[in-house]
Structures are given as C-alpha cells and as structure tokens.
Regions:
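Phosphate/pyrophosphate-binding loop motifs in nucleotide- or prenyl diphosphate-using proteins
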Residues: 1-175
Length: 175
C-alpha cells in the first residue's frame, strides 16, 4: 500500500475533515475561516521574505508560527492551546512604543513588505467577517473570536513599523 502525501482524495466530493474527524462541506464557515487565516499567513510570509529589518522579520516569523496552532484550534484540534490574544496585544504595544504611531489612514505602498502586510491585513479583516458569523451562532469561542478580531490590528501595526523604518532612511519610501 502506498502512503498518501498531499492528495488524500477525501475532498473529491466537496467535503473535508476537521481535526476531530468531523466531515464538513469545504465551503462551511469554519473551513472558510481557517482557510482565510491560511491565506493571511501566506501574505505575512511574503512580507517577511521581502523585509530587511531583522527585528521586524523576527516578529513576523513569530506571528506566522502562532497562526498555525490558531488555525488548527479553529479546525477543532482540541489538543492545541486556546488562542492567546495577549501575544498580539503585546506586539501592538511594542510597535506603538517604537514608532510613536497612532491610528491613521494610510496609503499602502511605502515599502514592499509594508504593502504585503496591508494585503495580509485586508485578508485578516475578511477573516473577521467570517468569524463574526460563527461567533454569533455560538460556533466559535470567545478567545478564538477575539484573536481573529485583534489580528488585523496587529498586522496594521507591523506595517506601520516597517514603513516607519523606511521613512527613517532605512529603506526607500514611495514618492
């Protein structure tokens, strides 16, 4: 018997398995939520690949690594820890302290990694819109909902940090 690697063929009829073995339609809100977070994580990775600021890269990597278990938890991998919002809030505060930035509307594009993070932020906002539907139906716990809700704020802060470094002459700003 051959071992399956990428292709399991289990989804060929439009369903997938959650971590607990439950079969659900591939277009269920839960699958849409962790799929949207997966997309967000890929954009964060793109930003990290384009980033030349070691401290920011380290935080981007930590965020990427944190998202894996969050997606697993949402996919009902009950052995994984409940998402911890304090990690995101600490990172937001760290960036605020470093940059002195407050909320403002921005024009993405001052740097490639900053622009990639703004794409990740908009994907995180889409995840929020999916999460709220699950939350209102009592299908998503408070901690997971709060984590998804705070994720776009965290990514926004990271984009501001990168663009702040760019404006300080440590990169090339958009004219």
């Amino acid at each position: 018997m051959s071992k399956k690697w990428i292709t399991t063929k289990g989804g060929d009829k439009g369903e997938t398995s959650l971590c607990d073995g439950t079969r659900v339609p591939k277009d269920s809100l839960r699958v849409e939520l962790y799929g949207t977070l997966d997309e967000c994580q890929a954009h964060i990775g793109m930003a990290r690949a384009a980033c030349s600021y070691p401290e920011v890269c380290e935080e981007l990597c930590r965020l990427e690594q944190a998202l894996g278990p969050v997606m697993g938890y949402i996919a009902r991998c009950e052995t994984l820890p409940v998402p911890d919002i304090s990690v995101l809030e600490e990172l937001i505060e760290k960036v605020r302290t470093i940059t002195g930035e407050t909320f403002r509307f921005v024009r993405p594009g001052d740097s490639l990694p900053g622009a990639a993070l703004h794409v990740a932020r908009t994907v995180a906002r889409r995840a929020e819109r999916v999460a709220v539907k699950l939350f209102r139906n009592n299908e998503l716990d408070d901690s997971s909902y709060a984590y998804v809700n705070r994720l776009s704020d965290t990514i926004y802060a990271l984009a501001l940090w990168i663009d702040h470094l760019t404006r300080e002459g440590k990169g090339t700003p958009c004219e």
